[in-house]
């Protein structure tokens, strides 16, 4: 019988990993109605990079790549995309998993290797992606602070007509 500490312990890191992932790029979802999913994520402040009836790419204001990828299909979580900083890592992964390096979606650019985790979820590893153009960041709201002098002395009006922008995944 294992103790709670043993059951909840994080597995040790591999001493010789196949590659070093440098970041989370995107989550991948499928939804029967891509347009409805796009509107849902826009309501939370994401921005559309590209969208049609079969595929939508959305991002936050600071994201350099699309951070939410929605494909048409039964409602499901499909997997995620991760990035590596070295093209050799893609080829090493492809060889180790008996797959190929392929061109990534044109809106993202670069190359990718698509793997499956033990539960069958897609894990896409990308390299050489093209950064998206920066989006204007929201201006910060000036607030009166107890020790702040001089006082701002003006009314702050918040814009509730649209959701706040999502900064980053």
Over which residues does each language-model region extend?
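Short acidic, gly/pro-rich beta-turn/loop elements at beta-sheet edges
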Residues: 39, 68, 90-92, 135
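Vicinal oxygen chelate
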Residues: 1-17, 23-33, 72-168, ...
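Conserved short beta-strand elements that form part of the metal-binding/catalytic scaffold
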Residues: 46-78, 122-129
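A signal for specific C-terminal beta-sheet/loop modules enriched in small/flexible residues
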Residues: 70-83, 136-146
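Core segments of cupin and vicinal oxygen chelate
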Residues: 19-22, 26-65
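A short linear-motif detector with a strong N-terminal bias
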Residues: 4-9, 35-38, 48, 58-62, ...
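N-terminal start-of-chain detector that recognizes signal peptides
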Residues: 1-3, 20, 28-31, 50-56, ...
């Amino acid at each position: 019988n294992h103790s709670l500490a043993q059951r909840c312990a994080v597995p040790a890191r591999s001493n010789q990993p196949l590659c070093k992932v440098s970041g989370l790029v995107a989550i991948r979802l499928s939804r029967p109605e891509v347009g409805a999913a796009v509107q849902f994520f826009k309501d939370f402040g994401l921005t559309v990079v590209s969208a049609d009836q079969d595929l939508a790419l959305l991002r936050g204001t600071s994201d350099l790549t699309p951070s939410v990828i929605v494909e048409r299909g039964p409602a499901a979580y499909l997997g995620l995309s991760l990035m590596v900083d070295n093209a050799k890592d893609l080829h090493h992964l492809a060889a180790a998993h008996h797959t190929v390096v392929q061109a990534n979606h044109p809106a993202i650019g670069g190359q990718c290797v698509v793997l499956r985790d033990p539960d069958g979820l897609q894990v896409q590893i990308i390299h050489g992606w093209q950064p998206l153009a920066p989006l204007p960041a929201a201006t910060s709201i000036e607030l009166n602070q107890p020790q702040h002098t001089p006082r701002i002395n003006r009314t702050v009006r918040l814009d509730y007509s649209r959701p706040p922008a999502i900064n980053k995944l």
